[in-house]
A protein has these predicted regions:
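ATP-dependent adenylation/nucleotidyltransferase module used to activate substrates
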Residues: 1-146
Length: 146
């Protein structure tokens, strides 16, 4: 990790992503939620023709506006992105046992719901801001998702 951190120091975002695609050919993926930061990163990937797989997670809880933006993005860039869905059987079991909104009831239920609804990539470049949401004092430009 230190070697990568050293190699990426001082590189632009585009150059950093290019470096990662060279170090991990075919294994770099970008997870987009279609937020502003994610749209900027997707634009950077597609405009520079970086060999990064772009994907999104449809958790079944997205706003209609998100679906509309997905369609607009697909039409504008004419680039593929994969859409992943939760495993049907696990989702059906969760809803049957705990209802549609169990994640509001407890932290444990929230973690269970997120575990069922979300997927992980081998290497992920999530678009995140440093300032909003929970404090991120240790937020790094690059980090490994586990």
């Amino acid at each position: 990790m230190t070697d990568i951190k050293t190699a990426l120091a001082g590189l632009s975002e585009t150059a950093a992503i290019q470096y990662l695609t060279e170090q991990f050919p075919g294994a770099v993926a970008f997870s987009t939620s279609f937020g502003q930061e994610d749209q900027v990163l997707a634009d950077m990937i597609w405009r520079n023709k970086l060999p990064v797989r772009v994907f999104t997670l449809d958790t079944g809880r997205l706003f209609q506006e998100t679906y509309e933006l997905m369609d607009l993005t697909r039409a504008r860039y004419k680039q593929p992105f994969e859409t992943y869905f939760p495993e049907t059987a696990a989702m059906e079991k969760l809803v049957a046992e705990k209802g549609f909104n169990s994640f509001y009831d407890s932290v444990e239920n929230r973690k269970e719901c997120c575990f069922i609804r979300k997927r992980q990539a081998h290497r992920m470049a999530p678009g995140r801001r440093m300032e909003p949401g929970q404090p991120r004092p240790a937020f790094r430009r690059r980090q490994r998702e586990v």
